[in-house]
Amino acid sequence: MLNKFCKKPLYEVTRTMARVAMGVQKAETVIKNARLVNVCTAEIQEGIDVAIAEGRIALVGDASHCIGPETKVIDASGQYIAPGFMDGHIHVESSMISVGEYAKAVVPCGTTGIFMDPHEICNVCGKDGVRIMIEDAKRSPLKAMSNAPSCVPAVAGFEDTGAAIRADDIREMMTWDGIMGLGEMMSFPNVIGAEENIHAELAETLKSDNIITGHFSIPDTGAALNAYIASGIRCCHESTRAEDVLEKMRHGMYALMRYGSAWHDMPVIIKAVLDNKIDDRFACLISDDTHPDTLINEGHLDHIVRCAIKEGLDPIKAIQYVTINVATCFRMDHEMGSITPGKCADIVFFDDLQDICITRTMIDGDVVAENGQMCVEIGPANFPEHVFHTMHVGHPITAESFRIAAPAGAGKTVKTRVIEIIPNRVGNYERLLDLPVKDGFVEPDAGQDVMKMVVFERHHETGTKGVGFLKGFGFKKGAMAQTVSHDAHNLLVAGTNDADMALAANTLVECGGGMCAVADGKVLAVVPLPIAGLMNDLPVREMAELVAKLDAAWKQMGCVINSPYMTMALVPLACLPELRLTNRGLVDCRTFRFVPLFAEE
């Protein structure tokens, strides 16, 4: 199975590798006189040649004897070469584009492989959604390796999703081509609590000899972390403190340090490496969630590597964190992750080690991108019709749908549980605030930066909804709505008044899902996401333009935080601390219990 991500399996071409290395058979391509970033020994080797045949590296050293009349020679004098970059944890759906369009954005940035967790579309479309993503990936040269979603729903019993995944589904998916392991195990309470179905999922993965990826988001480095790792979980991307990273690596867990469009954990947690004299083979850099405007304006892993270097990380180490360390984490280092004989010829070229900007990307020995542009054609997408029909709210949404009745006997104010977001972080705070009551209904309070929020179930026409209040976005007017609302991806609406909230909600119902901003009875911006309410197959630049218009609309309404729609999308995710709102109600994610909206109740 592992060889399916290379042009040819090594067992088919071992004789060719030997012949080319010895010069008996000439190489298809030779890279001459490069500065090799050797991720195996953490050194720069000057004047290195690389001979390539059948998509693999046959020789590293002096390749003069490997050059024949038909050999393509690439003069890399003065340039650095490194293994292709790999993202160890990514949700392509968060980029709002198909895998094929995603490849067009990231391959020119030096990304040659990703380990994607398609649990967003799985929450809407079930296992079929995972197959759709795997199939879509086949139209591009990007090595889009997939993990089977583990927690659908994210935390059972707290929300309603479009589908559910159980151990027998995991057993089936582990037999699929393209599946590398189990997606992030978000249900850490059930792991450490030895819940039967969750541990059955772990067992099915381990029996298939695949790896389990993690999501341990609580600040516990004692018995709970040990129980989690001892259950077979190999890596985690949810560290928000340097001590979390350090303890995870000390316990043999790969620490995937995140730097996405909205989650800027890396500058804080990389201090685990910078401030301690430790072996960092268990450290990786990942993106998790990246918006199209970030991909266009800043880049992908190349951007994260540059940011890590600016934080003080040695450039060679930064490159190791997106190459050999990732490959080893996923037990793929025998195939990729280094420029060494026998490995896939996934290679990136750049001029400056301190400011890494990719000039050429090679995958399986073929130059697929150069100077920021793809060199190969990627065919059109072909999605099944049913993924374009996933908005099943089941009842009319009007301004009255957003009224929140005050408890009996309430005075002019009522003490209310409010979710306060933390910009650029995945966590939030529970606050108890006095909110105004008018004509028997609880109102938003712009003076406290508090707006109203409702989550409507949109998969099975159940008519259920959760109501709450939200602080920290800075809205002075208007409303927003989005169907990108992790992980159930129900219809999330927040705003300052009921009329604008209703208009925002109905705008998305009519267009099949997406994100929109509304103010004063007018739609300011819409990002249509008709594929499961999560993605569009428009080119990434067109999507980036739509997102930029949405961002401008949010600013017009008063919100100036970074990637606010991504922060908003996490408000319903009931596996992250502290307080969340799903279609079933408010969830205290420290105790995993529903709590009343009003503190007096």
Predicted regions mapped to residue ranges:
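Solvent-exposed alpha-helices and their adjacent loops that cap or buttress functional pockets
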Residues: 22-24, 43-44, 66-67, 136-138, ...
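Divalent-metal coordination cores built from histidine and acidic residues
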Residues: 2-20, 25, 100-211, 523-528
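Active-site microenvironment of metallo-dependent hydrolases
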Residues: 1-48, 52-53, 58, 107-109, ...
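Active-site beta-loop-alpha junctions enriched in small/polar residues
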Residues: 91-93, 119-121, 149-154, 185-188, ...
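Histidine/acidic residue-rich metal-binding segments in metalloenzymes
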Residues: 129, 164-184, 190-257, 264-285, ...
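Divalent metal-coordination and catalytic microenvironments
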Residues: 34, 55, 78, 89, ...
